[in-house]
Each structure stands twice: as C-alpha cells, then as structure tokens.
Curated annotation (Swiss-Prot):
This is Akuammiline synthase 2. The lineage of its organism: Eukaryota, Viridiplantae, Streptophyta, Embryophyta, Tracheophyta. GO terms for molecular function: acyltransferase activity, transferring groups other than amino-acyl groups. Pfam families: Transferase. Its EC number is 2.3.1.322. Monomer. It comes from Alstonia scholaris (Dogbane). Keywords: Acyltransferase, Alkaloid metabolism, Cytoplasm, Nucleus, Transferase. Pathway: Alkaloid biosynthesis.
C-alpha cells in the first residue's frame, strides 16, 4: 500500500474567537496528563456507488471549521503548562491518496502500516512551546473508501472529551438536527486549579514514568463475547464476585504478559504496578456533565507483589487489587488531589517507580463506551476504529489499550505495545490464544461495495 500526500492546509474557526476567550486555562489534571497525541483512526467503506470523495473532503473541512468555533481551544496553541492561547491558528488538515481497495486492507489489517494514516506520531513525547492540539489526515482509497486519522493532544483533553468533540464534529458534518452540546470549559480548572509552575524535576520524573526510549511493537488481539464471559467467571473471587469485562481482561493480560516477561528476560520482577485512568466526572459531587472539557481523569494504581515460586498469578488476585484501586478514588480522595500532600506523594511515587528496575509497570487504558463508533459524518458509522502501529522513539512502553470492535458489538480489542521478545513468547502461548484471536479480519457491512 502506497499513500501519497496531496495537500496540506490549515482549517481555522468559521468565526473569530472572542477576545475574552483568548486564553483557555487548563486544570491540574491537564498538567498531569501525558505530553503526547492520542491517535484515533476511523475506517469508512464506500457504501454508495456515486460517492463524491472530493465533496466529502470539502464537507469534512467545512464542518471542522464550524465545530472549531465551538471548541475554540482546539484551534489554538499550547504555549505553556497553564494556558492554551486561543489564537485561531487552526488545525492542520492533510489530504492523501492510497492505492488499492480499503476492503483488501481490512481483510488482513497491516498493523505496522497504520501510522501512515496518522497526521502526527501517536503516543510519543512531544516537546515545544507551540503545540497544536489537533491534527487531521483524510486518506481516500481508489474505491473511494475513506480513512480519517485524528491526533488529539492529551494535555488538552482526555479520551472521553475527545469522543465528545468528534461526535459533535460528525453531527455538524452530517447536518444532524440534534443540538451540539456546548462544552463546559470552566468546571475542571475551577475544581482543580493548575499550578502556576511545575519543577523541572517533576516534569522529568513524569516524562520518565510515561515514556521510555526503547522501541515497542504493536499487536492487536480480539476477545469475543463468549471468551470475555468465560474470563469474567474465571476471575471471580469472594471479594469480587462480579468482575467487569475490563477488570477480567486486565487480569488475564497481566497473567500472561508477566509470564512472557519472565520467559523472555529470565527474571522475575519483585512487584507489578498496574495503572488505569478513571473518569472522575461521575465520581465528583455534584457530578459533572459528559460535556466537561479537558482531562477529568486520575490514575488508579494497583500493586501485586510477585512470588518467585509461583508460575502464574492466581485467579482473582489482580481483579481484587484493581477493584480496590478503583474504589479508592472516592469523593474524599478526589477532593484532596490538588493539595500539596497529594502532589508530593505523586512525585515520590513516580520517582520511586521509574528508578526501580524490580518494578514492572502495566499501563492500561480503555476507550470503550466513549462513542467512537458513533462518529458518523453522513456516510455511515465507521466499520473499524483503530489505534496505531509500532512505537519507535520515546514511546509509552507496555501500553495496553482496550477498544470496542464495532457499533453494538460485545467483543473487545486489545492493542498491546511491548518489546519484541515478550510479544514473541506471548504469541506462542496456547492458553492465551485460546481466548485472544490475533488480528482478525474487519468485516464490512453487507451493503459495503468496496
């Protein structure tokens, strides 16, 4: 597959941002977010014999200009750790052409090629004094199938807010009569005021926690609904009789990844550290609306002390620790996040973890139930929403992402970034493969014509 860039242009808001909105104040939680782009890749087959690809690209750009008037911080530039300058500099929009058929690509998805659909490096450490919060790349196949690659800067929004933005853009794009809900730009920074300055040591420790210099390779696996039900049953315990889908999958993945690590490296870590971001919008009192802009998340930290004599983590052990970590983020602990004590504790934790080679970190996240399969611009919902390909320079190591597989589907995709020797062991593990299908075909709807 060859992709040729045809044009690059900057899409600016349809109307100028008012002067009193020139600076968007970030929150403390934004400051704690990774300095990287979140990648999302949407695949839209051609369902119409007379599809006008050029007209669709124009529609995308015009609707983007309209939504940027509402989501004006995304058309600005991240200038420092406290503010986004809402200067209407705009969003880069790249048009590209791919040879071949989209359906052929989806029959056997080339994970390593996915980065070609993105306008930026996904999940890489970004440094600079003027970072664009959003970048778009639209790639049209010869069959008029379209792939939309979106990169959104994590220090401005979390995945839930990104989903709200993309669904709102799609509503305008398809001419929906539904009202686009106005984003709430003030609640997050009011509840969690930013620190006017962050020490260089904290920034360094934070970057070292999330980003490491080794190359990570991406793999995609799919757990069908039957497999997930079985794994939930296996993960039950007296303390957690009803593990969620994500909790059960987290335990299963940690069980087999830790085994793969021990086999590949011939060593056993002393402790496993398992993290997962938690959406705080509904945990805050009173709850915040889904339209709350920014990062309104906090990491849940779970720890598992390894026993060298154990060949495998016992069923239910990881789920219990993860459930306790989630439960610890209650109203009281959330209210204390902006205190000096909490800041000091986080700083000490980050430093102790990244400097201790005996701690193995598994960083989980999930985009399930965030509406990414509802991003319909008028030519149907995407048949696939993908993550990204391999991570080359300063990428998040041991990144584990759960994603939905389609609209109304009960299956879950696992996107796993790890070192090649660990992945090689995992891909030969019959017990793991009994539940996880490696990179299956993406099936088009029955009326897909490409």
């Amino acid at each position: 597959m060859n992709i040729t860039i045809l044009s690059k242009e900057t899409i600016k808001p349809l109307a100028p941002t008012p002067h009193h909105h020139k600076y968007y104040k970030v929150s403390l939680l934004d400051q704690f977010a990774p300095s990287s782009y979140m990648p999302f890749i949407f695949f839209y087959p051609n369902k119409f014999a007379d599809r006008d690809a050029a007209g669709i690209l124009t529609q995308l750009k015009e609707s983007l200009s309209q939504i940027l008037t509402i989501y004006y911080p995304l058309a600005g530039r991240v200038k420092d750790t406290v503010y986004v300058e809402c200067n209407d500099e705009g969003v880069e929009f790249i048009e590209a052409q791919a040879n071949g058929s989209l359906s052929d690509f989806l029959k056997q998805p080339d994970i390593a090629a996915l980065n070609n659909f993105l306008p930026r490096n996904g999940n890489g450490l970004e440094k600079g004094c003027s970072i664009s919060p959003v970048a778009i790349k639209a790639t049209v196949f010869e069959c008029s199938g379209i792939v939309l690659g979106v990169c959104i800067f994590h220090k401005v929004v979390d995945a839930a807010a990104a989903g709200e933005f993309l669904q709102s853009w799609a509503k305008i794009g398809r001419g929906s009569k539904e009202t686009v809900e106005l984003p709430n730009f003030t609640s997050a920074s009011s509840l969690f005021p930013p620190r006017e300055s962050l020490s260089s040591k904290f920034v360094r420790d934070f970057d070292n926690f999330f980003f490491q210099g080794s190359k990570s390779f991406m793999r995609r696996f799919v757990f069908d609904a039957t497999a997930i039900t079985t794994l939930r049953t296996k993960a039950t315990s007296e303390k957690v009789p009803n593990p969620s889908r994500v909790e059960a999958l987290m335990e299963f993945v940690v069980q087999h990844l830790s085994t793969a690590f021990k086999t590949a490296k011939s060593e056993t870590p002393e402790t496993l550290m398992i993290t997962h971001p938690v959406n705080l919008r509904k945990r805050i009192e009173p709850p915040l609306p889904d339209s709350t802009f920014g990062n309104v998340i906090w990491l849940a930290f779970a720890f598992y002390d390894c026993d060298p004599s154990e060949t495998k983590i016992k069923p239910g052990d990881v789920v219990e620790r993860v459930r306790e970590a989630f439960a610890a983020l209650d109203k009281e602990s959330i209210s204390e996040l902006e205190t000096d004590d909490a800041f000091t504790s986080l700083s000490e934790l980050l430093e102790s973890v990244y400097t201790n080679e005996k701690i193995k970190i598994y960083r989980f996240t999930s985009t399930c139930n965030m509406g990414f399969y509802d991003v319909d611009f008028g030519w149907g919902k995407p048949v696939w929403v993908a993550h990204m390909g391999n991570m080359v320079d300063y990428r998040c190591k041991q990144q584990i992402v759960f994603m939905e597989t389609g609209h109304m589907s009960k299956d879950i995709e696992l996107w796993l970034a790890a070192e090649e020797d660990e992945l090689s062991v995992l891909e030969k593990n019959a017990e793991f493969l009994a539940y996880a299908t490696p990179n299956p075909t993406i099936w088009l709807d029955s009326d897909g014509t490409n």
